[in-house]
UniProtKB/Swiss-Prot annotation:
Classification of source organism: Bacteria, Pseudomonadati, Pseudomonadota, Gammaproteobacteria, Vibrionales
Gene3D superfamilies, A to Z: 3.30.420.40
CDD domains the record matches: ASKHA_NBD_ANMK
One Gene Ontology biological process: amino sugar metabolic process
Record-given protein name: Anhydro-N-acetylmuramic acid kinase
Function: Catalyzes the specific phosphorylation of 1,6-anhydro-N-acetylmuramic acid (anhMurNAc) with the simultaneous cleavage of the 1,6-anhydro ring, generating MurNAc-6-P. Is required for the utilization of anhMurNAc either imported from the medium or derived from its own cell wall murein, and thus plays a role in cell wall recycling.
Pfam families in alphabetical order: AnmK (PF03702)
GO molecular function, one term: ATP binding
EC class: transferase
UniProt xrefs under PANTHER family: ANHYDRO-N-ACETYLMURAMIC ACID KINASE (PTHR30605:SF0)
Catalytic activity, reaction form: 1,6-anhydro-N-acetyl-beta-muramate + ATP + H2O = N-acetyl-D-muramate 6-phosphate + ADP + H(+)
Length: 370
């Protein structure tokens, strides 16, 4: 049996709703969440990131400053977690930091993915070995560089007689399909909270539609819904991945240009858009007497979205991962702690059947504090 080690995972997703940190104990395939902490992203930094993510012109100086500021933000988040938990830096084997994705283009003649946040700053400010840059080796091997979390899902959730699909609804929605035969499939289904949040910010000056109270006041516009679903992404075969570089507010405004739809009805339609594009990808994987859809991420807190998922999948059990004893709000941060452990010990951490990479690989670059 391997020695029990402590790792910290740091995750900042496409929704830009904060930095999630998780302190976990890892031993073989056993994982225990010891502490977690959410750290806010300052409004100015969030806006600068949004501008870059939607393709607004920038400069090398601005990008360098973002890299620096995110390094400080992520290290501040780790230090806050340590203070909150009572653990010290010397207790921690390593940090796994995803970084902030600012662009993701894994296809074409020059594929690349870009996550920023200087890991040298994280390692030196915290005094803890840091693993970062998890995605680019998978892209170099011909993969999408995403999703990386299905390998972690396979470790903690098991499909025995029926399919288990783990659905993470962050800014983008992605699925990990765990089949009874042991096969794993995973990819991004399309928008999660991203368009709903962006529209709510634009029309209501609120970061998100809490409890879907605004969306519940509206009605689905069938013509708009059909139009949104025509985007080329949904016809692409797996493996595939996407992000804010495609599904963003300018994209939505372009789709709305030929429609005259009340803002409230737009919000309700966006919720239905997310639900239907998820279900159309999930439903074909049903196997066994009781397939399960286990939901994590911010979307699990949206009662209307959860209601629609269950209504559209009547033969499935739809439930948050918390009902399985795993806190869905910390799932991705826990996953990057696990990915850091895999890198520290030189173990493979991608699933070529999921990402499309040519082979297994141990992902991430190690940064030492000394």
């Amino acid at each position: 049996m391997a020695e029990r080690e402590l790792y910290i995972g740091v995750m900042s997703g496409t929704s830009l709703d904060g930095v999630d940190t998780a302190l976990v104990a890892l031993q073989d395939d056993n994982i225990e969440l010891l502490a977690h902490h959410d750290y806010p992203i300052p409004a100015d930094l969030k806006q600068r990131l949004l501008n870059v993510c939607i393709g607004q012109p920038t400069t090398l100086i601005a990008m360098g400053e973002l890299e620096h500021d995110l390094g400080h933000l992520f290290s501040d988040a780790v230090l806050a977690l340590l203070q909150h938990s009572g653990y010290r830096a010397e207790h921690i084997r390593a940090i796994g930091c995803h970084g902030q994705t600012v662009f993701h283009q894994p296809t074409g003649t020059k594929p690349f993915t870009m996550q920023i946040g200087d890991a040298n700053i994280i390692a030196t400010r915290t005094g803890i070995t840091t693993v970062a840059d998890f995605r680019r080796k998978d892209v170099a091997l011909g993969g999408q560089g995403a999703p990386l979390v299905p390998a972690f899902h396979r470790t903690i959730f098991h499909a025995e007689q029926s399919t288990v699909v783990v659905l993470n609804i962050g800014g983008i929605a992605n699925i990990s399909v765990l089949k009874p035969n042991g096969e794993v499939v995973g990819y991004d289904t399309g928008p999660g909270n991203m368009l709903m949040d962006s529209w709510c910010q634009k029309e209501r000056n609120q970061p998100y539609d809490k409890d879907a109270l605004w969306a519940k006041q509206g009605s689905v516009n069938a013509a708009l819904l059909s139009h949104l679903k025509q985007d080329h992404y949904f016809a692409l075969p797996a493996p595939k991945s996407t992000g804010r570089e495609l599904f963003n507010l300018p994209w939505l405004e372009t789709q709305l240009a030929t429609f005259s739809v009340d803002a409230t009805d737009v919000q309700r339609t966006l919720c239905e858009f997310t639900a239907q594009t998820i279900v159309e990808q999930v439903a074909p994987f049903a196997e066994g007497p009781q397939p399960q859809l286990l939901v994590c991420g911010g979307g699990a807190q949206n009662p209307l979205l959860m209601e629609r998922l269950q209504a559209l999948l009547p033969s499935w059990q739809v439930a948050p991962t918390t009902q399985m004893g795993v806190d869905g709000d910390n799932m991705e941060a826990m996953a990057f702690a696990w990915l850091a452990q895999r890198r520290i010990h030189g173990l493979p951490s991608n699933l070529p059947a999921v990402t499309g990479a040519s082979r297994l690989a141990s992902l991430g670059v190690i940064y030492y504090p000394d």
